[in-house]
UniProtKB/Swiss-Prot annotation:
Belongs to the multi antimicrobial extrusion (MATE) (TC 2.A.66.1) family. MdtK subfamily. Multidrug efflux pump that functions probably as a Na(+)/drug antiporter. It comes from Escherichia fergusonii (strain ATCC 35469 / DSM 13698 / CCUG 18766 / IAM 14443 / JCM 21226 / LMG 7866 / NBRC 102419 / NCTC 12128 / CDC 0568-73). The chain crosses the membrane at residues 11-31, 53-73, 93-113, 127-147, 160-180, 188-208, 243-263, 276-296, 314-334, 350-370, 387-407, 418-438. CDD domains: MATE_NorM_like. It is a multi-pass membrane protein. The gene is mdtK. This is Multidrug resistance protein MdtK. The keyword Cell membrane applies. It comes from the Bacteria. Its main location: membrane.
Length: 457
């Protein structure tokens, strides 16, 4: 029991700064929406539309680079720190190539926006302008993630937290300058949010790079002499590890986007109630998501040390802590669901629906916690391909079709509206959780030599 308590302490020490960093990042999006809304409703809508396209694109790049964390954690655990600098340099090359691809996609996103049904031309122009300003921040964001993943792979999660709050503090005044046109800058409205956020991502990258360059604990990594040229073999391996993670993130984001589109014809009350429950659930999701990142670090580090038993301890501890957290948040959600809904809206019908959906959200949180921590464990084992297949099957083969049938058809019961989609979420996430656990058990039962050989690739 003592080893699990010690492991839980180390996991929480890693996870808490990640939680705070995620809160800072979420707050940046909230600040953009509120400040754009203060300028005009059209500008706020433009930021919302632009963000709905930006998120899947940038999260794809983000997921691709998540491969660096277990790679660095295992090199650190095995005492092969002399190889870390080369991996990080190739991460920067990969981030550069991916950011160019993302920028190209976002520059041409106007075709998607203008193809939306009955969209106001002025709104479309503002959304395109916002994206074309924001896309210049894509390289800064991805370069920042490379440096952050380096730190997290070395079990240093506090720098990412500090840089997240620096970004938030810089974002507010820079937003103000570019939205309203102060200090000689043009008045850009919602487009100014894109300019400000892009600038903030570069500030965060420069600040993180400065930390990495000057941190005493990384002196031996900085002093390593390696060629700075692209290494196709290393980048190919990073892509092989990262692409399944990127696609899994993409599937998850697009699933919720598709459900939002399917709910939209049902009416304002249904859309509002669904959005309130989803927004609150996404806030609660920060906890298991951050714990998942910590579990990846601990499992990777233990495998690097050559101890499959300690890796199992880290995995089991992460799951236990995650289920405890999810149980607490589920009880909180059930107990205060009406008060939570009132924070968003005062329409009685919306509050009633949102409170009902939050009962389903409470169940959803437990399944979600298990599956996202399971994903973190599999990343630690470098078993990322299974994450892709599990996510695709659970979300798109099981979750979405069952949700659609329950919500909009009478094949099983009378159409349930948004609640049907939420039952679909529960089916999908529970299926993902079960499959993640089965895959984890399969990996852990392999001979230690095979586990360590797979992890060292």
């Amino acid at each position: 029991m003592q080893k699990y308590i010690n492991e839980a302490r180390q996991l929480l020490a890693l996870a808490i700064p990640v939680i705070l960093a995620q809160i800072a990042q979420t707050a940046m999006g909230f600040v953009d929406t509120v400040m754009a809304g203060g300028y005009s409703a059209t500008d706020m809508a433009a930021v919302a539309i632009g963000t709905s396209i930006w998120l899947p694109a940038i999260l794809f790049g983000h997921g691709l680079l998540l491969a660096l964390t277990p790679v660095i954690a295992q090199l650190n655990g095995s005492g092969r720190r002399e190889r870390i600098a080369h991996q990080v340099r190739q991460g920067f090359w990969l981030a550069g190539f991916v950011s160019l691809l993302i920028m190209l996609v976002l520059w041409n996103a106007g075709y998607i926006i203008r193809a939306m049904d009955n969209i106001d031309p002025a709104l479309a122009d503002k959304a395109v302008g916002y994206l074309r300003a924001l896309l210049w921040g894509a390289p800064g964001y991805l370069f920042f993630q490379v440096a952050r993943n380096q730190c997290e792979g070395l079990a240093k999660t506090k720098p990412g937290m500090v840089m997240g709050f620096i970004g938030l503090l810089v974002n507010i005044p820079v937003n103000y300058v570019f939205i309203y046109g102060h200090f000689g800058m043009p008045e850009l409205g919602g487009v100014g949010c894109g300019v400000a956020t892009a600038a903030v991502y570069w500030v965060m990258f420069v600040a993180m790079l400065s930390y990495v360059k000057n941190a005493r604990s990384m002196r031996d990594i900085r002093n390593q002499q390696h060629s700075g040229k692209p290494d196709t073999a290393v980048m190919k391996r990073l892509v092989q590890l990262g692409l399944p993670i990127a696609l899994a993130l993409f599937f998850e984001v697009t699933l919720f986007a598709v459900v939002a589109l399917l709910v939209s014809p049902l009416g304002i009350v249904d859309v509002a109630g669904h959005q309130i429950a989803l927004n609150f659930s996404s806030l609660m999701f920060v906890l298991p998501l951050s714990l998942s990142a910590a579990v990846t670090i601990r499992v990777g580090y233990r495998l690097g040390q050559g101890s499959t038993l300690d890796a199992q301890t880290a995995a089991r501890t992460g799951l236990m802590v995650g289920v405890c957290m999810a149980t607490v948040t589920a009880i909180f959600t059930v107990s205060f669901r009406e008060q939570i809904a009132l924070l968003y809206n005062d329409n009685p019908q919306v509050i009633t629906l949102a409170a009902h959906l939050m009962l389903l959200a409470a169940v959803y949180q437990i399944s979600d916690s298990i599956q996202v921590i399971g994903s973190g464990i599999l990343r630690g084992y470098k078993d990322t391909r299974s994450i892709f297949f599990i996510t695709f099957t659970a979300y798109w083969v099981l979750g979405l079709p069952s949700g659609y049938i329950l919500a909009l058809t009478d094949l099983v019961v009378q159409p349930m509206g948004p609640a049907g989609f939420w039952i679909g979420f529960i089916i999908g996430l529970t299926s993902a959780a079960i499959m993640m656990m089965l895959r984890m058990r399969y990996l852990q039962r392999l001979p230690s030599a095979i586990i360590l050989q797979r992890a060292a690739r």
